[in-house]
Amino acid sequence: MEKLQYELQGYLEIDRYRKQRFLYPLLFREYIYALAHDHGLNSSIFYEPTENLGYDNDNKSSSLIVKRLITRLHQQNHLIISVNDSRFVGPNRSFYSQTISEGFAGIMEIPFSMRLVPSLERIAKYQNLRSIHSIFPFLEDKLSHLYYVSDILIPHPIHLEILLQTLRTRIRDAPSLHLLRCFLHEHHNWNSLITPKKSTSIFSKENQRLFLFLYNSHVYECESVLVFLRKQSSHLRSISSLAFLERTHFYGKIKHLVVAPRNDSQRTLPLWFFKEPLMHYVRYQGKSIMASRCTNLLMKKWKYYLVNFWQCHFHLWSQPGGIHINELSNHSFYFLGYLSGVRLMPWVIRSQMLENSFMIDTAIKRFDTIVPIFPLIGSLVKAKFCNVSGYPISKSVWADSSDSDIIARFGWICRNLSHYHSGSSKKHSLCRIKYILRLSCARTLARKHKSTVRVICKRLGSKLLEEFLTEEQEIVSFIFRGTRLRSERIWYLDIIRINGLVPHS
């Protein structure tokens, strides 16, 4: 793989690429398809890893098919091979389509990777930023001091031509963009690429990498104006004394303070400014969150600006209710499988002054994250682990597998859900999900052996329970003793994608 990357780097450094920025000749290079197949060039930075569908298990056979594909590309008058071509009809037709699309995706990623990877390498421990859980510590630190939150659903493009037009600002190679357009037009269902929920689309599985690249490029352009305005906008709050500053995590926030000099007539006290950005913004896939300390009127102006910007520049029509504005104090928003919000926690502080003591009632804001039980049960119903009432049922399609395989599958799902939802402040709903999965596993084994759940549990004993325990539970139990384990939030920095059972849209 290092040899392939070295060869690719050598091609990119030649004068012809520097002057003309041609990318399409890479379609005739065999190592491009090897990199696309192996997800090289750190491609996981741009999107989540996907399954390699349609490839032969035999690498030699796959390599031979790629060589035949390149040979036929040389023999064509144009690079795009029609789906009606009789020479490409057969068991390899799906592979050819997928290979070309992944080759296109890998080539189009080159300009982005050359700019992004060096900038990330300058950031210490930038790998941690890839974790989905890295968003929540940011929200935990910021949202407790903000007033309004806006849920934004980024609209899908109405036509693929809009996606291709957005690439022109990032990729200067016009022939490559023209070839990409021709390739997409060769497929009858090419417009269905913009709706990934359609399983009948030819892009739904085979060409998922190309779809993700185009969609992420579209989202990047839609939010680019937000990032620009976010950097340009900030407001300063004048505070006459340091005592008015919030004492929570004071030493961590002291770096955000600046002292503004006064004129000669105002030398009594310095002016303290709290350098706070006007807007905080986070996003995952097509769902984004904006939060601010500004007024409701200003939030509505942001909403009006976004809707008009998308309509004028991208011809995107925001869905009714695509942008919701709510107060953080009395509203919770659903994001990345968590129901998040800010709630007031009552505190009683005892103050001692000489011989007198006082009890002071106060309240502090805390960022709260819980796991909603009904969306998770809905996902389990779709996966046929339980019915609509949450009653566990057997997984009949797994009944033909071995006992160890059945237990391992259920245990793997349970551990992944526990690992992802470790940041919940209330673990009661997660315990119910674990109970459903354990009982569904027992019912599946009972169905296989034509027995009862009680007999299966008695025969397997602790083996059935140990498979559902996570290593994190054993380690964390040494850190948080007693009941604190149920209320402590733990964020992991190794989660780069959401479990399939977690509803996040």
From Swiss-Prot:
GO terms for biological process: mRNA processing; RNA splicing; tRNA processing. Keywords: Chloroplast, mRNA processing, Plastid, RNA-binding, tRNA processing. It is found in: Plastid, Chloroplast. The keyword Hydrolase does not apply. Disulfide bonds: none annotated. InterPro entries: Domain_X, Maturase_MatK, Maturase_MatK_N. GO terms for cellular component: chloroplast. Its main location: plastid. It comes from the Eukaryota. GO terms for molecular function: RNA binding. The keyword Zinc-finger does not apply. Usually encoded in the trnK tRNA gene intron. Probably assists in splicing its own and other chloroplast group II introns. HAMAP family: MatK. Belongs to the intron maturase 2 family. MatK subfamily. This is Maturase K. It comes from Nuphar advena. The gene is matK.
